Curated annotation (Swiss-Prot):
Organism: Xenopus tropicalis (Western clawed frog)
Record region (Disordered): 95-142, 247-296, 368-388
GO BP annotations, alphabetical order: endocytosis; protein deubiquitination; protein K48-linked deubiquitination; protein K63-linked deubiquitination; proteolysis; regulation of G protein-coupled receptor signaling pathway
Binding site for Zn(2+) 3: 43, 48, 64, 70
Protein name: Ubiquitin carboxyl-terminal hydrolase 20
Compositional bias per record (Basic and acidic residues), positions renumbered to this chain: 264-274
Name of the gene this protein is made from: usp20
Function statement: Deubiquitinating enzyme involved in beta-2 adrenergic receptor (adrb2) recycling. Acts as a regulator of G-protein coupled receptor (GPCR) signaling by mediating the deubiquitination beta-2 adrenergic receptor (adrb2). Plays a central role in adrb2 recycling and resensitization after prolonged agonist stimulation by constitutively binding adrb2, mediating deubiquitination of adrb2 and inhibiting lysosomal trafficking of adrb2. Mediates deubiquitination of both 'Lys-48'- and 'Lys-63'-linked polyubiquitin chains.
Amino acid sequence: MGDAEDFCPHLDSIGEVTKEDLILKSKGTCESCGVGGPNLWACLQDGCQSVGCGESYVDHSTLHAQAKKHNLTVNLTTFRVWCYACEKEVFLDPRGPPASQTTSPRLSHRDFPTSAHPLKSVPIAVGDDGESESDEDDIKPRGLTGMKNIGNSCYMNAALQALSNCPPLTQFFLECGGLVRTDKKPALCKSYQKLISELWHKKRPSYVVPSSLYHGIKLINPLFRGYSQQDTQEFLRCLMDQLHEELKEPVPLETQEREEEDRDDQREGERGGTVEEDFLSCDSGGEMGDGEGGGGVGTLSEMELLIREEVGRGLSEKEKLKERKLSYCHRRTSSEQADEDADVDTAMIPEPDNDAYVHCSSRSCSPHPVESISKHSSTPPRSSPLRTSHSYVLKKAQVLSGGKKRSEVRYRSVISDIFDGSILSLVQCLTCDRVSTTIETFQDLSLPIPGKEDLAKLHSTIHQSAVSKAGTCGDSYAAQGWLSFFMDYIRRFVVSCIPSWFWGPMITLEDCLAAFFAADELKGDNMYSCERCKKLRNGVKYCKVLRLPEILCIHLKRFRHEVMYSFKIGSHVSFPLEGLNLRPFLAKECVSRITTYDLLAVICHHGSASSGHYISYCQNVINGQWYEFDDQYVTEVHETVVQNAEAYVLFYRKSSEEAERERQKVVSLAAMKESGLLQFYISREWLNKFNTFAEPGPISNQSFLCSHGGIPPNKYHYIDDLVVILPQSVWEYLYNRFGGGPAVNHLYVCSICQVEIEALAKRRKTEIDTFIKLNKAFQAEEAPSVIYCISMQWFREWEAFVKAKDSDPPGPIDNSKVALTKSSGQVQLKQGADYGQISEETWNYLLNVYGGGPEIAIRQTVAQYQEAEHLHGEQKIEAETRAG
């Protein structure tokens, strides 16, 4: 650190500052806006006590430096010094303190990491999920903050408290706040980030008022406007959908290809790989397809054994029809998400002529209309719209669906990384034995609560046959511990001693899962449209989990809505606090290794279907105790209170002792402080996954790198929010353990991307300026001889591109949806088509740039114009004659 280039001439302006002073300031707030840490900045000018926020908020520290001409500032989280005049990180030289100074050590260059960049750091596997258990946390742990009821907002408060106690999500907003960037209104992610910071701040109040998020959700969905009671599950879906939309980023093509290769290799190793089996692969989209015979998973004989084994295990036919009817009544009324709650059985959609069909999976799409609804969909799972992130597709479906003009872009976000899983559905025609496969992404599982008859069927069939399989529902109780087992035994004994007409049947969460995954007979009004038979046939539907989410959200269907009335199912459903085992419900193709879950939070509803009150029980990640969150009141409760609760929504998190050992290993390596010649940059977001996920997946540095290996120019100004520096030993351990990458030792702005950005900006300006010029000339024409028609769907894509709202240009002009081709070959405009009118010059310009078609021209000859004028004159004379 003694190089001349590292010396800053402004160091003489620093006053007497001790490290204790800075630690004390780090516990304060920004003097301008009042926001708390982390990453506050303190001015080092002699005599100045200013503390301001950084770029993650308003950046009052920079505003202060510019206004007061104070050059040096220190980050109160990392203790790194930045000089605004030199525009670089500087290091304090180790000059000794004056004789009059106290024994407190003065800040020197030894107090700062030796790095060329003022990077903020994420704790590596510190304690439990990065939470420091200080003495203050032992007295009153962080996170125990209530929320004020803003007029029947208990449904929102309960949901927010449950999400707040999901460590992977909360740690992202606390530790990776710089990644929370969006230009989409109402910027709900910013409101949520602020709320989480308030809930988990050391200097937290007893309760907060979530007014910003409350008003933001009302702008998004009219359903939540007003002050009437709403469904907490509806709120959860709306909130997480919006957070995903605001935080989503495209998945790099290289990542998609690597994931596909890895999963293909895994399938080849596990199954031996036949031609039919190769149809299953990983790709973009949440699409679905079907294959002949055993085209989905395994051979046809294996399919038949799996499916026929489950026939007759499901709910009664009467209950199925009722479920389908009720599911329609429970759809959302929002215009943007009108069908998102519907339990759609996508496998019963009438199929096209080929052997595969593609399911609409992007968020802008709506589900296909169907007449039949099955209890097996996970509401539906995420049927409208399904997310594209981390979803699967059948290669056969992709090939036969026809080439797309624009390649489908996969998106991911912290929401999809945490909550998204996938389900494999199989539908078999009982006449020709044809099997179709459907792979869908879900964000939550909406489970039916089986009745007395259905429960008896489940216990007599599924539980008996499951004994011969690897893993049973009963295995999920093995990890609960003796206390939980004993309490559960007592509860079952008490229930058995009381007549069933008084108490009702004993229902477990495993029973609800078994009912959800049980085979569904497709017959009567619910017959299956078989492509091979070309008619409706009896069939059977069977589904399994293909990929488990990091946090499993389970919704119990307690509310039923009939035509004339609604009612609530008040049956108690027992659920395990630890060791929920989903292995019995996994497909052979499942890519998840960890299958056990521990409970994080449960939302309960007290009252009837028309009115009531929501509360939540959550386990604090710091001390492991359970607390009741009832609006602004937070009370510690015993775990037996939680187990006896009337659960409505449950949040389970993957549990893994191996992941804990991995974190401790990394902590040990980091503490050794072995000197290495190289330091490595790693994605801050992935490191947060390592700290909080049971299965973080391969290292992914693409979040801050472009395809050329550099930093995209638009990310360089906040690169310190995206990366963390690791010692060589820690990087090598993580890389050898998880793979991925790429390795990064040097950060630089990508010059290739800079040239591409400038060229793209020039292209956008040229196209929009040319269009405006030609369109003005077109508007000035009084009687154009020809008018060209263009599809507004394509035009809106082009407009979004030239206005920089979409990074990718549109494909070729596509007028197929507004064109009608006659038998003579003449192309005409469809009646009622969504089109726009442009001039011939504008059409030729766009056609030369993008190509496409077909051309739709409306020509007006002079004869036609004169004939129209003559007819108009005759009508005028006739009208005057009648008036006379």
